[in-house]
Amino acid sequence: MSQLPAVSSAPQTGAASRDRRLPQAEVGGGRRALPGPARPGETRGRPMAAAREGPAAPAAAARGGRVAAAREGRAAAARGGPGAAPRGGAAAREGPAAAAASREARMAEVARLLGDPLEEEAPEGRPRSRAGGLAAMPYMRFRHPLSVLGINYQQFLRHYLENYPIAPGRIQELEERRRRFVEACRAREAAFDIEYLRNPQRVDFDILTFTIALTASEVINPLIEELGCDKFIHRE
C-alpha cells in the first residue's frame, strides 16, 4: 500500500517531461510550435532548392524593393501633394516681393549716396520729402557733378578765375567781337533792305556782295584766326 503513490507518481513525471518536449501551439496566438530537428530529406533538398533559386532570388528581391519604394513614393506624394502646393505657391509669391523690396532698398541707398538736394536748389512751393525709397525720388534733384569733389560751380569758377587771370580778358574780348558782328549784320541787313526797295533787280547781286563782305569783314577774320579755322580756309 505504501508503494502505490510512488508507482503512480513515476508515470506522471514522465508524462510531464514528454509534454514539455512536444511542440506546443495555442489557439489565437501565443507560443508557436518550435522547429524540430531537420529531417534527412529536407536537409538534402535545401542545397538543391537554393541552387535552383540562386540566379532568380536577387532579381526578385530587387524588383520587390523597387515596387515597394515606388508605392511608398506615391503614397508620400499623395500625402504631401495638397500641402506642398500651397507652400510652393507661397514661395512663388514671396519671390517677386523680396526682389521688389531689394530693388527699392538699392535705389534708396543710391539716392542717399547721391545726397539730398541743396537748400538753395529746392524748388519753391514744392514739398521736400525726406523719406527714403521711391517716395523721395520725384522731388529729388541731383547735385552738380562737381559736388563729388566737395565744391560747387561757383567755387570752381572762382578758383579758375583766380588761377587763370587771363581768362576774363579773353572771354570779354570774344563777347565784344560777337557784339560787333551782330551789330554789323543788322546794319548791313538794313542797308540791303533799303537797296531792295530802290532797285529790286539787284537783289541777287547784293546777296552775293553781302556774303563776300561778311566773310572778309574785320569782325569775322579775327574770330576765324582766334578759333584756328583760318588754316582750313583756302584763300586766294
Swiss-Prot record:
Its main location: nucleus. Residues 170-190 form a coiled coil. One of its GO terms (biological process) is cell differentiation. InterPro entries: EID. It is found in: Nucleus. Residues 1-15 have a biased composition (Polar residues). The modification Omega-N-methylarginine is found at residues 63, 79. Residues 32-68, 75-102 have a biased composition (Low complexity). One of its GO terms (molecular function) is SMAD binding. Residues 1-102 are annotated as: Disordered. GO terms for cellular component: nucleoplasm; nucleus. Expressed in heart, brain, kidney and pancreas. Not detected in placenta. Keywords: Coiled coil, Developmental protein, Differentiation, Methylation, Myogenesis, Nucleus, Repressor, Transcription, Transcription regulation. The keyword Nucleus applies. Heterodimer with EID2B. Interacts with the C-terminus of EP300. Interacts with HDAC1 and HDAC2. Interacts with SMAD2, SMAD4 and with the MH2 domain of SMAD3. Interacts with EP300 and acts as a repressor of MYOD-dependent transcription and muscle differentiation. Inhibits EP300 histone acetyltransferase activity. Acts as a repressor of TGFB/SMAD transcriptional responses. May act as a repressor of the TGFB/SMAD3-dependent signaling by selectively blocking formation of TGFB-induced SMAD3-SMAD4 complex. The N-terminal portion of EID2 is required for nuclear localization. This is EP300-interacting inhibitor of differentiation 2. It comes from Mus musculus. The gene is Eid2.
